[in-house]
């Protein structure tokens, strides 16, 4: 089984964690070209383009200007992203064998690097899927990557057993020909819901935390099939069979928030 996670907006440039190997992103050339184009924008342009504040615009202006420098720091993707999902995944305590297993059974989407393996070494950036760049052809990042990623993604899933556990945000489907993905492999999408005001609701913070915890559960326990996902339990979240079907696995928390 292969797990898909979304990249995070927040990134780190340092880590003391040792990994068994470091790999080059399969779309390094494309990422380099994207970063070069992004480096042509001014601070004000980045602020508007990425919908970020002035401080973050300055930070990412510096990142893109330094992207191709030899001394720019870089980290394995699994350690570089620091959003809520990755904090809960907590790969800092992974063993050598767990990192190696993750390398074969986890993929991370990236608007800059396309599709990453956990130990692919990357540099810090900020990018959104709706950003349009002139080369090639004034395409959004979604359109740019779709034709490049779909074959590789499907091949990765098949190598990992032909089953995808989709724990990425919904917008990431647009990076691929998702209908084709669903035709060629089995896709299971876990959902996480909590009780609020007497109704089940999807709350972003709980979704992100649960995605990270489930990914950790899968990698630590080497879950190879959807049936194994049903035993996931965390902070009151349990598999809810009555709300689930073969494509959608719903996990609910019985506590009112």
Language-model regions: role of each:
Residues 91-245, 250-257:
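Internal, well-folded beta-alpha domain core
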Residues 4-93:
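Active-site helix-to-loop segments that bind/position phosphate- or nucleotide-bearing substrates
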């Amino acid at each position: 089984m292969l797990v898909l996670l979304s990249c995070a907006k927040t990134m780190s440039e340092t880590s003391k964690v040792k990994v068994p190997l470091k790999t080059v992103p399969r779309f390094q050339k494309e990422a380099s070209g994207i970063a070069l184009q992004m480096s042509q924008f001014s601070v004000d342009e980045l602020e508007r383009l990425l919908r970020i504040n002035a401080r973050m615009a300055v930070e990412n202006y510096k990142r893109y200007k330094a992207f191709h420098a030899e001394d720019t720091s870089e980290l394995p993707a699994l350690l570089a992203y620091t959003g809520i999902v990755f904090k809960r995944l907590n790969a800092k305590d992974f063993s050598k064998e767990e990192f190696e297993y993750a390398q074969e059974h986890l993929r991370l989407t990236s608007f800059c690097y396309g599709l990453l393996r956990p130990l692919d070494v990357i540099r810090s950036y900020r990018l959104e899927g709706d950003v349009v760049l002139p080369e090639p052809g004034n395409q959004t990042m979604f359109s740019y990557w779709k034709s490049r990623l779909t074959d590789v993604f499907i091949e990765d899933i098949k190598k990992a057993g032909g089953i995808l556990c989709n724990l990425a945000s919904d917008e990431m489907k647009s990076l691929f020909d998702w209908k084709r993905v669903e035709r060629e492999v089995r896709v299971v999408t876990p959902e996480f819901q909590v009780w609020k005001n007497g109704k089940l609701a999807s709350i972003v913070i709980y979704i992100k935390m649960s995605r990270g915890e489930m990914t950790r559960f899968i990698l630590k326990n080497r879950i190879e099939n959807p049936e194994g996902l049903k035993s996931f339990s965390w902070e009151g979240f349990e598999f809810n069979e009555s709300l689930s079907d073969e494509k959608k696995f719903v996990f609910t928390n019985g506590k009112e928030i």
